[in-house]
Regions:
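Conserved active-site-adjacent core of cysteine acyl-enzyme catalytic domains
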Residues: 2-21, 62-169
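Conserved, non-catalytic sequence blocks in retroelement Pol enzymes and Pol-derived host proteins
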Residues: 26-27
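Short, conserved active-site loops that position catalytic residues or coordinate cofactors/metal ions
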Residues: 36, 56-61
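A broad structural signal for alpha-helix termini and local helix breaks/kinks
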Residues: 44-45, 90
Length: 169
């Protein structure tokens, strides 16, 4: 799986493998990026812990791509926007606003395996937002590894059997 990705995890504490809030599906054909990021935050934190600034900035920084007709947002979220958002979240965590850290990975850094940063984040209770290629680029949320299988939440729709992704580690 070669794609852009970044992981989000709480800084310095072990997380119970229990989702903190329900995950959401996309509201449109274009908002898989912000929906995946918001789901990552929702998965890791209780509602009361999530500052409004995080929600606002995720929506503000995403949906930055223009369609071929010049309509803003109708081509989703760029990798540059996700990188910027990842860096912003990391900085937000460093100043103590939310116990979160984030790292943007690209190119050869993005792989699944025993020594990968993705697996490390998932094993430590974090999540990863990953850009996959179905028919088009699409962001999804990885929430863990269970019985050697990667746990993936596709916020677009429920996966049909032919689209189910299982990765055995």
């Amino acid at each position: 799986m070669r794609c852009g990705m970044h992981s989000i995890q709480t800084a310095g504490k072990e997380i119970a493998k229990v989702m903190k809030n329900p995950l959401h599906y996309q509201l449109s054909e274009y908002d898989c990026g912000p929906t995946s990021m918001l789901n990552g935050i929702s998965y890791l934190f209780e509602r009361e812990e999530i500052p409004p600034k995080v929600i606002r900035n995720i929506m503000l920084y995403c949906l930055d791509c223009y369609s071929t007709e010049g309509v803003p947002g109708k081509c989703g979220t760029s990798t540059a926007a996700m990188m910027f958002l990842s860096n912003w979240l990391c900085g937000f965590g460093k100043i103590g606003q939310l116990e979160v850290s984030s790292e943007y990975l690209s190119g050869e850094s993005v792989y699944l395996g025993q020594e990968s940063r993705i697996n490390d984040a998932l094993k430590r209770g974090g999540v990863a937002v990953v850009r996959l290629y179905y028919d088009v680029e699409h962001y999804v949320l990885l929430t863990g590894i269970e019985d050697g299988k990667l746990l993936l939440f596709n916020n677009k729709t429920k996966l049909t059997p032919e689209k189910t992704i299982e990765y055995f580690i």
